[in-house]
Design a protein with these regions (language model features):
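Alpha-helical junction/boundary sensor with strong preference for TPR arrays
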Residues: 3-7, 40
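Short, low-complexity N-terminal intrinsically disordered segments enriched in polar/charged residues
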Residues: 51-91
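A solvent-exposed, acidic/Ser-Thr-rich amphipathic alpha-helical stretch
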Residues: 82-138, 145, 159-160
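Short beta-strand edge/turn micro-motifs at domain boundaries
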Residues: 162-185
Length: 185
């Protein structure tokens, strides 16, 4: 390649990565970006696109991982498992939630899990997921449906539950973290 003979350094490799990404060849983009990063691994400007190219090349796996994270986070909430729930939220930003009862949006935290409830879930299932990524692959929106039933503890009345839902996940240095969830009627 003429570019490589003129200049064989990190800028050249970074440019090759960008060109490969523009062509949709994220495997090649990742390969060149890793080579550029090898020149300067500490505070390297070449590090920024590494996760982008990896996520683009592994979009299906990333999507499946996010869907699994959503299910695991929901199970942790239902089971009152603060430790597991904490894996999916960030210390740097809140998880803002809107419930299907149409109340105000609020910050959902480990404190919410410990609250007493006047109902118990009989069943709760998530299904029909779709994953939508931002162009830089650093934000994902999951859309899905939830169904099940719960019983009020004071009256033993069973209520069927069905709603559509969405969540916003942000890629952080500690992994994907949920920033927003909406449970719409």
């Amino acid at each position: 390649d003429k570019l490589e003979t003129l200049h064989d350094g990190p800028n050249s490799l970074d440019s090759r990565a960008e060109i490969a990404a523009m062509k949709g060849d994220y495997e090649m983009a990742l390969k060149y970006q890793l080579k550029a990063f090898d020149y300067a691994t500490s505070s390297s400007p070449y590090q920024y696109n590494l996760p982008v190219y990896w996520r683009k090349g592994n979009q299906s796996d990333v999507s499946n991982g996010l869907i699994e994270a959503q299910k695991n986070m929901q199970n942790a909430i239902l089971e009152g498992n603060v430790e597991d729930f904490s894996k999916y939220i960030s210390n740097d930003f809140s998880l803002v939630t809107g419930d299907s009862n149409l109340g105000d949006f609020y910050n959902f935290s480990t404190e919410n899990i410990a609250q007493d409830r006047n109902y118990n879930w009989n069943s709760f299932a998530l299904r029909d997921f779709e994953t939508h990524f931002s162009p830089d692959m650093r934000t994902a929106i999951l859309t899905f449906y939830a169904s099940g039933s719960y019983t009020f503890t004071d009256s033993s009345e069973e209520v069927a539950y069905s709603t559509r839902a969405s969540s916003v996940w942000i890629a952080t240095d500690q992994g994907w973290k949920c920033a927003h969830a909406n449970w719409a009627p």
